[in-house]
């Protein structure tokens, strides 16, 4: 893991086309602005985990429904 210190107004680059800038530093929070191509998906980690869990639950439900339907002929 790379750890980088940045001050308000400073940026870092990921590759050639993603720029992350520190826009505000408050008590207990840092506000970032992200400039990236529209093709790049940017999600907060907690939201990503929530979506991932919902997808797992949905897939499990789909399988049980298919098994029930398969049993009916």
From Swiss-Prot:
Gene3D superfamilies: Translational regulator CsrA. It comes from the Bacteria. InterPro entries: CsrA, CsrA_sf. GO terms for molecular function: mRNA 5'-UTR binding. This is Translational regulator CsrA. Keywords: Bacterial flagellum biogenesis, Cytoplasm, Repressor, RNA-binding, Translation regulation. GO terms for cellular component: cytosol. Pfam families: CsrA. A translational regulator that binds mRNA to regulate translation initiation and/or mRNA stability. Usually binds in the 5'-UTR at or near the Shine-Dalgarno sequence preventing ribosome-binding, thus repressing translation. Its main target seems to be the major flagellin gene, while its function is anatagonized by FliW. SUPFAM superfamilies: CsrA-like. PANTHER family: CARBON STORAGE REGULATOR. Homodimer; the beta-strands of each monomer intercalate to form a hydrophobic core, while the alpha-helices form wings that extend away from the core. The gene is csrA. The lineage of its organism: Bacteria, Bacillati, Bacillota, Clostridia, Eubacteriales. It is found in: Cytoplasm. It comes from Clostridium kluyveri (strain ATCC 8527 / DSM 555 / NBRC 12016 / NCIMB 10680 / K1). Belongs to the CsrA/RsmA family. GO terms for biological process: bacterial-type flagellum organization; mRNA catabolic process; negative regulation of translational initiation; regulation of bacterial-type flagellum assembly; regulation of carbohydrate metabolic process. Coiled coil: none annotated.
